[in-house]
Every structure is written in structure tokens, then in C-alpha cells.
Amino acid sequence: MKITFDTKSFLFDGQRRLILSGDVHYFRIPKAEWKDVLLQAKQAGLNAISTYVPWNVHEPVENKWCFEEEADLEGFLKLAKQLDLLVIAKPGPFIRTDWSFGGFPNWLHAAGVRHFRTSDGTYMAAVDKYLDKMLGVLARNQSLKGGPIFLVQIEDAFDLVPQDPAYLRHLENKFKKKLQIPVYFNLADPSSGGGFVKGALLGVNLDKEAGQSLKRVRELAGTHRQPLMVSGLLTARAEYWNDRSERASRTWPEVENVLNEAVAQGAALVNLTPFAGGSNFGEMAGRGLSGDRSFAAISWDGGAPLSELGVKTPKALGLGLWSRWARTLESSLLGSERINEDHPVIPSELSVVAREQGDTRIYFLHNPTSETLNGKIQVDEALHFTLAPGERRAYAFNLGVTPNLSARACTHPYFVEHLGTRSVIVLWGEPGQKLHFYGSGTLDVVSRSSDQILVEHERKGFVLSAEFSNRAQRLLAKVMFEAGQREVLFLIVTRHLAEQSSFDPAKGRLVLGSSEVDFSRKMARLEPGSRTLISVEEATLAEDYFTAVAPEAKVVKAQPAGLLEETALLKRAEARTDWAPFSVGKDLAEQGYHTDRVWVRLRFNAAQAGKKHLIFPGLEDQAAAFHKGQFLGLVGRLGTGLDLDLPVKAGVNELLLALHAFGRYSEGSKLGEKKGLLLPVFDGGEVQNFADGWHFLEAAGPLDFQIFSAPTFSGRGWELGALPKTLERSGYVCARKKFKVPDWAKRVRLNLHAGDVRVQVAINGELAGTHPDARGAQFQEFEITPHLIKDPKAENTMALFFKGPTRGFEHCELLFLGPELKAEIDACPGYYAADETEALKDKNWAKTGKGRWGFWRAQFKTPPLKDVAAAVLTLPKHGRGVLWLNGHNLGKHWKDGVGEGMKLPLSWLKPANDLLVLEEEAGLPHEASVTFHPKFNEEKLP
């Protein structure tokens, strides 16, 4: 199949097609579920799916490629082809999808890569090797070779980072050399004007507002002939442990409004991001940008149209209806031109976009006000409507719906399906609303109906009128016409029932809810110009999808199978003989550890017995600390703090750390940040966490950091109080704090946790740093150099100058550091870091007991899976750690999570199951239960 494009659309062997796509990530979905998910995509009206291709999934270890199980990319592509779904492939090399390290493999650190997403030679050498392999896979499955891939994305949202034109040109040349199908750049913020190669095909991400972004993309495209592409229409927000700031998902009306605006502006491709939810299994959950404790949850759902559990949400049902409407108007949407004449629409407060193709006109209306508006639009017929605040709606006039029938106008949306020699027109509305369909031509009526329907013949054709029933479980109206040799069936149903419709053109089947529509009929002939009121017997659905009672879910309580707490684990670690030197400042991967969990041992001398206060400013991300077999607590950014009190003896002391790199940044300037012990451990120090006690001042005009010492500004005095996280102020806000540097301090560091808040930091009137920095850092570490400090014995002033809202600012901390701890540091993997099967073989499992840190094991049995739709694990007493099920790494768990449970893939379950929990925070033992949700009202998928 040959793919071309022009300014209106993509053409497939010369035929225009409106592309409705959605993200379905094969690597986030168990392979056994792929077919069901893709079928659901088709049921929702999609004719394409989009997927990222993560480098770290396919080459987790350098030169060792993985294409098995959930990494079976070609198997996924072949399945899409079998189901007649097109594919948009997004192989990166960077991917922006809440995935660990942006899809980069950890071993790039060991390969010497330091500058990611740039034209740096070391980075590009690794990228070229990856693309040679992966683009070869995609090339074998491109449309010209009979595969499903018709479009490929280069990189991802590069407009959000500092520009490197040489890097983008190199990638574009590489992609075009390997592929014979269109490639494009995706823009997250087209207002920046960067992120692409001039003349390249462009796509854009959309959230709630589409107009300005689409206009800007057209400007960037310039004279280059290309269709308008929405490469990412946001339908959901990823969920993050301990961070609910982005949990507000998009509702279906919000998504529908953006869809309507996109096609009104002429979009020929719309990709929903995402369509299907999934899971961040294993170590692949990315770290977010909203503070130290922001990590992607196991569940990658956030309100996707098809949930992580495979359940259709109202978004999927609404999308199915909208996509059928769009297909009915497809040729008119793609072939039309925008017209700018005065529009026959009142009131004037409405925003109107009109498109025209031949005699067909489509009017897209938008109510931008905060009030409900009643209006009228008149082309040939007068249509009255009501639009809620912010609502968008489209009306088509003179639209050909079958070879012998045109719709002059209609008060309600509809779609058309062709089943052999029969055409079905489904019209939907809310109970109590009145429908008027104005058709062309004189038709013979063949009727079977459940309520009164008025059919009037007139000079221009006929008018069909009805009222939508408030009886949701009944088929409201079914009227059949004959137009020449073709039967035309009108179904007038509630929106809920229309959302449940499915069609099988090959078999001539139409299903509403769970009932197949009966096409048997009685003939009743209408004379031209007659006025007929049709009232026949009711046609009741066999089952109402919305009111039937679902079978009760089965809850199975897992039976405890033992503890392997810290004492046993420590003994095993201390007895190991494979300890090796551990380097401060190097990533775990640089030191040969292909895991995020290792044992680290510090040996140091103390001149005398007593207590040491150690500071760990560079520990990423947390470590359980042990001394003389005792659990001292968690240290690090995810622990109780960066410092630790340690009782020591005179002579050699040993501190054992179970270091856990909890997740790698998925984007931003911290992408590529190393994991491990990145700075020395300091012998003595103080951490001042400035979360309250701020002096702050508000100003309406420009604020310069030099004015921090002024007692007043613009007549406003300094105010004393906490700096709220949700403080919203216009203009500028300045906050200041006094501090003294202890005599013993050797170094002073400032850690600023400010999300994406724009802020300048000044020390004693001199600029110390800017946040975010040039690369968009969300967390900044500043070394406070000696020249910024006054006389060490004097009081110093730190000032923060916020430009705009301060929402997202968490806190800042000053670290006063003593001398570096003179320590011998070594490490070993231990089975704490290896796979969990070694832990299960341990002979030191205790049947009962308590522990502060360690493994907890439980077992449970599975009911017959043929009756199970989904399984969900609940851990009511858990804290933070890692989960395994039957040898599969489910991912990380956290008590501050987002949701009531965690998905257990059915394909990973056995009749008897082993659940293993690594607990690092809440203590042991645990409790666990699994809820098995039964299959209920499954769709009759064609």
C-alpha cells in the first residue's frame, strides 16, 4: 500500500482516509491481552493505533536484544495487521511517556554517554546502532512491504528542550534512509517554534484548547504541503505515587470538545493519548518532575478510555459514537474547504467554523460563554439548539448518507452503517428531546416501531419526527424505508443504547446492548404527500446493559507463607565474599550493576567512641541503614532525611546500606541523572529545611534581586508567615530567609524543590542561580560559593524571587557540610538485588514474627480463569517496596499510592500462586487479598 499526503489528508493508494488512532503500548500490556485490547480499539471506531518502542525494553543489556513475550514487537504488529488496524510507530530514541529514563537503557552510562538528546558523538554512536536494528524491524512491517505501519515519529517533543538542529537533521536522514513511508516530528508546545527540521511533517499535542496550537502548526509548516495532524490528544493523566496534583483526568465531554475543534480546523489525523491504559511493570516506572517523591505508579491509566483492567469507560463508549459520526461525514470533512462568509447562526455570541464541499456544509458551533445559549441555524431548514457553557456541536446540511438518500438537516447527531443491501441510520438523543430528520426523495415506508413516529411527505422529500423515550431499556423506534433497491433502516434510540451498538457487515448483523436487531417487517405503503402516524408493538431488548446486576466479585485472602526479615538478610550479606570497590559519583550501571538495588558497605575509623552525624547529600534515591545488625532507618531523599545518627566505637566501624534507586527521570533536564552514591558522605553537618517561617513581599511591577534588603516596596511591608504551596498571586512574590553559616562548615549547598515554578535565588544580594535552568530543571542543586557568603560569623540573607504563581513550590534546604568521611566503600549485589527466586530458596524463612525491613511471602489460589475478567491485589498494610508474582516483577508499591489496588495479569496467574513483597518502610508482616472480577456483559465483537 502506497502512502501519500497533501494539505487535506493522507491518501492510501489514492484514497483519502480520516485517521482516528489511539495509543496502545504493547510493552505495558500482557501479551495474552493484546488481541482483546486491539479489538476494543476497533469497537471504539479507531482505524489505527499508535505505540512507542522503548529502547530499554528491547536492549536492556548492551548488544543483547529482547523480542520475546511483551517485547514481541513484530508479533504485535502482525496482530494489528490481521485486525486491519494501521500503526503509527514511535521508536524514539527518547520517548515521553512516564517511562524510566525516557526509554534509554541504563547501560548508556557505562558506555560513557553524558549528553543525551544531543549531537554528542558518544551518544549518537549508541543511537545509530539502536536505530540500525529497530528501524530494520519497522521497515519490514511498513505499509509498502504489506505491513501495518504507515507513519513513524522521530524523537518526541523535542521543542521542550534546548535545540540541537544537527541532532534532529541526523535523525531525520537516518529515518528517511531506512523507511519508505512518511516520518514526522511531534510538538508539545508549538509556540516555542522549535523541535523539528524545516520542511518536515509536523504533529502537535493537544490538551483542552486546540485552536491556537493548530493555527501555530500551520504557520510552522509554511508553504510545505502537509495535512493537519493531532499526534497526541490528551485523554488521561499518568498517576504518580505521593503526588495527586495531576490526577484530574479528562472527561468525555472535554475530549469530545477537542475532537470537534480539531476536525473543524481540518485535522486529518487525530491520535488519542492514550486509548488503552497499561502497567509500568518491573523497574520501568519513570520519575516525575514534581519533587523528590514523585514517581510513576504501577498503574498507567489515569482515566484512559479503555482502563488498565480492560474495562470500557464512558470515554470509550462516547468515542465509539463520535467516531461513527465522523466516519459518516468523512469524505466531507476531508474534502471540504473552510468558508469565511457570514454564517446563518444566532446568537452572535457563538463561535462558528463552517466547512463546505459541493452542496454539503458542516457548521461547528462553540459556546465560549459561561451561560447556556439557545440558538438557531438555518440553511434550508431551521434547526433550533441549546448549547451548554463550553460545549461544541456540529450540524451537517445536504449530506449524502446512502446512494438514494440525502440528509437535508437533522436536529440530532447520527451515523450510518451499511450492511449488505441495507443501510442503517442510527439517531440518538437524550430522553424527552424531540427529533426532526429532514430527508430528500419520496420513499416507501416499511415499518416496525415501539412508539409514535410521524412521517410527513413534502415537496423536498420527507420529515421524520419522534420523541426520545425515557425508557432506556427499550428500543425506541425502528422505521424501515425502501429507496430503490436498498432498504434504509432508521433507529431512533437513546445515547446510552447507541453507545452499545456493534455491527458486523460481513454477516449483516446489528447488535444493540446484548440484543440482535430483528430485521423482519410488515409492508405498509405510503402514498406521495401522505402524512402517516406509525404506532406498532414495542420491541424490547433482551437485556439492559446499564441496569442488569453484575455477578458478585470473589475475594480471596492470601495466606501468609513466611517472613525473611532484616536479621536473616544481613547475615547473608555480611557472609558474602564478592564485595567489590564501589565508586562515589558513578551510576550503578557504570559499575556493572544491571539492577536498581545493591548492598553498599562503608568502613571507617573513629578516633573515639560516641555518636557520628553523617550527611548523605548524594544518595539516590534511598537506603535502609544497618549497624551491628540493627535497622537504623531509611536515609536519602525518600527516607526520613539526608542525615543519620550513628553510634560508633573507637576503631573500625561498619555501616551497611541497602541502596534502592527507586526510579529514573522520564524527562526534563534531570534525564540521565545517575543513581547510586553520587557525592561523598560527610562527617558532620546540618540540614536546614526551609518550609516555613518565610518573610515575603508582593509587588506588582518588576522585581530585582538586589532589592531584597529593602524594608518596604511599593508601600507594602514584609509579611511574616508560611509560604503556602498553593499561593496564587499576580505580579511577583519575594520570599527571604536569614541564616548563619556554622564555624565548622566546609561546604554549603542549596537544594531547591520548586517543580516548574519560575524563581531566582539570591544570596546576600547576588544571584546564585535560576530555576528552572536553561534545560528546564525541576530540581536544582546550587553550590553556595564562598564569595556569596559574608563574614562567616555574620547573618546572611537568602531571597527567592517568584515570577508568577508559586503553586508547585515545595521547599528548599541548606546543607552545611563538614569534612568528607574517610571511608572504604564497597558493594555487592546479593539476592536483595537479584531476582526474587533466590530469596524464595532461602532456608531462613520464618513462619511468624515481625521485622522492620525485608521480605514477606503469601500464597493464594485462583478460581477458574475462564470466568474471570480481571484480578486486583490489595495490600492494606504496605509501606513502600517491590512486588513479585510467580516470578514476574509487578513493580514498586507505595502506601501513598493512587488507587485501591494493583492489577494482576491473568496470564501470570497459576492455580496456586506465590506473592512476594519487599517491604522497606512499614514493617512486617503484611496482609493481602485478591479480588477476582467476573466476566459480565461482554461485547459481541465481530
What are these regions (language model features)?
Residues Y26-Q43, E62-L79, T251-E254, Q608-L614, ...:
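Aromatic- and glycine-enriched glycan-recognition loops and surfaces
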Residues H594-N605, R729-K740, K850-P863, E900-M902:
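Short beta-strands within extracellular/lumenal beta-sheet-rich domains
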Residues G610-H627, L655, W718, F739-G765, ...:
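Aromatic-lined ligand-binding clefts that engage carbohydrates, nucleic acids, or primary amines
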